[in-house]
Amino acid sequence: MRRGPQVALVLGLLCIYLAQANFAPHFFDNGVGSTNGNMALFSLPEDTPVGSHVYTLNGTDPEGDPISYHISFDPSTRSVFSVDPNFGNITLVEELDREREDEIEAIISISDGLNLVAEKVVIVVTDANDEAPRFLQEPYNILVPENTPAGSSIFKVQAEDKDTGSGGSVTYFLQSLHSSKFTVDRHSGVLRLQAGATLDYEKSRAHFITVVAKDGGGRLRGADVVFSATTTVTINVEDVQDTAPIFVGTPYYGYVYEDTLPGSEVLTVVAIDGDRGKPNHILYRLLNESDGLFEINETSGAISVLQSPAQLRREVYELHVQVTEVNSSGSPAAQSTVPVIIRIVDLNNHPPTFYGESGPQNKFELSMFEHPPQGEILRGLKITVNDSDQGANAKFNLRLVGPGGIFRVVPQTVLNEAQVTIIVENSAAIDFEKSKSLTFKLLAIEVNTPEKFSSTADIVIQLLDTNDNVPKFTSHYYIARIPENVPGGSNVVAVTAVDPDTGPWGKVQYSIYGTGSDLFLIHPSTGLIYTQPWASLDAEGTSRYNFYVKAEDMDGRYSLAEVFVTLLDVNDHYPQFVQSVQEKTMVLGTPLKIEATDQDAEEPNNLVDYSITRAEPVNVFDIDAHTGEIRLKNSIRSLEALHNITPSGEYSWSLQVQAKDRGSPSFSTTALLKIDITDTERLSRSSMAAFLIQTKDNPMKAVGVLAGVMAIVVAITVLISTATFWRNKKSNKVLPVRRVLRRRPSPAPHTVRIEWLKFRRAKAASKFILKEDPPNENCNNSRVGVTVPPRAPALPPPPKMASSTVAQQTVPTVSGSLTPQPSQQLPTPKPLGGPAQSSLVSELKQKFEKKSLGNKAYV
């Protein structure tokens, strides 16, 4: 009973104790590399941007009470971080710099409101490549002797980089225009004179080289970066005595004028020690004194002449001057020599002068033929030019003054004296016909003297004529028009040719030749063209002549011109009727026509007018004066009217018709015309007879009508055969024509008509007069049933001047008439003036006949 209350008491006290106990919160320790916990062994790169969330404090309270976080720093240090008290997020608020502060001490704490737990942490700042190399002990100025051996070490540069690792390692290299003479060790920074290189104080007293120091690179803000630095090393070259004296102002030329006094200074030679850093004293002397003509001052280097220049024999003297260095101890050192050229200058007191074979001369004459060969030398001119001065005063130019481009003078530049040569440059310009003589001035003028002395000489060239021109006509062609009835020996036209050459070469001889020249002559001296004494010209035979006329000089040089002669027609032919007595039949109401021809060549001589000069009885017929158509007067309209006019009551009349040309004077011819008059009723009784009567005077009309009828019959036959063939073709069968003819025989009237036409055609053709048998055009070797076409007589042979290769052909024309007529004698053509004129045919007529024969050969 007693133990129960005690136990209860103990339990009660325990509960009260437990209720009043509160345990402290604590941080989690998550180890290295964790971004939350108690920041144990936490490190942070120095390039972390300000404001970055870098860590999260994380802890807990055993009772589960709310906790808060805090971070604090030593008052003597910076507050680098801040913390969110509720969530424990730590933020960087200051930039980190490992080179200044590689560790940061901080106190972090956690509290549940009653208990506060604090811990001291060390935050390691890790390196980033944020530092560039930096050279130590700048600036770099060093002194190096110029005789330093190649490959020697001359200096060492040093740079440091505060970064660690590769970012803190430094390498060196050169970046300079003079890097070809120097080199640097990339690891140690030692500068050396490159192998094969030398220093020369006299050429370059200082060298400036740029050395670059570069780190090994590293990460910075998430990128790989490399930093570098540069410095300039000034290398001053120290002079040493290693160079001979140097002459200043070389080369040395001195001039002594011929009026210079003895003892006058000519020029001064200047030399300096080649080692300019520590120069020695210089002494001068002449190695050759030129026979005592010149001397030199040993300290100043001044050279003087000792004698009068007029006594000097040479124009140019060459001296050799030697200089010697004297060191501080007074002993000779390095030496040098230099040549000195001294020229004796002549005064310009003589102008250039021209000389001939007998002495000074200012005029030269020469005779030569025109048009000499290109490049020929005028050997007849003996010219010498001289300038008595010396040197530049005796230098002058030569040139010709006058018409340019004809001659060229050689030489063009002369020193002292030269033989003058004149060469032909333009042969065409040396023309006797243009100029009988050529005059030039030969000018010599000094080149480099201020006085510019000059001299001139006249050159006169007399030209001799040669036969270099061809006679030339005043025109390329001559046109003449003469009447056809001019008598023989009449003047036609005068041609003129001119030869500008002189003497016998300028005389011109004329001659003519060519087709059409046989009827003409030319005076050999005057060029007058006239007709042959026996020539008889006829415009109706040949109306135009053309030939060539030649003008020739005595050497055979010639030119040609063409002459055209046109014959003017003269009314010398009478109109001619075909027959002097003609019989014609006139159908009442239809005119008939008569025709006369006039053989004159041109109008109006060959135009014919017709008139009735006599009629019995009169006032029955009218005639058209231009066409020759004869018709009854309008008042006569029937045979009864005609019957009442004649006393005998006949229908036949005799008329005398006149044909008169329009020439001046005019010619006329008359013919007797017998006319039989009938009317249409009589002709209708026999249509064929009427047709024959109507075509009595025109047989070709009858032939044409018959040929037309035959052509129509043949065409109808061809159409019937073609239609039959195409009809059978549609049924894929080809039937012989004979079968078609049997099925469909020709109507009887057609047969009668064709037989009648054949009869008439054979009857009419029997009256034709054929000159030769026609060829077998059907090529069947059978002439039975073949109608022979009429043929005209063969053409006469072509003229002798025509080509013999043209074949003679026959012309298929009708040579008969439907009604026989008594033969009529054609008028005899007028002779062409004898055998000479009959053989003369113009070229135009020949071409026309050739063309006509060629065309007929293909008919």
From Swiss-Prot:
GO biological process: cell adhesion; homophilic cell adhesion via plasma membrane adhesion molecules; photoreceptor cell maintenance; photoreceptor cell morphogenesis; photoreceptor cell outer segment organization
Chief localisation class: membrane
Extracellular topological intervals: 22-701
PTM description: Undergoes proteolytic cleavage; produces a soluble 95 kDa N-terminal fragment and a 25 kDa cell-associated C-terminal fragment.
Sugar-modified residues: 58, 89, 288, 297
Signal sequence region: 1-21
GO cellular component, one term: photoreceptor outer segment membrane
Highest taxon listed in the record's lineage: Eukaryota
GO molecular function: calcium ion binding
Biased composition (Pro residues): 790-800
Name of the protein: Cadherin-related family member 1
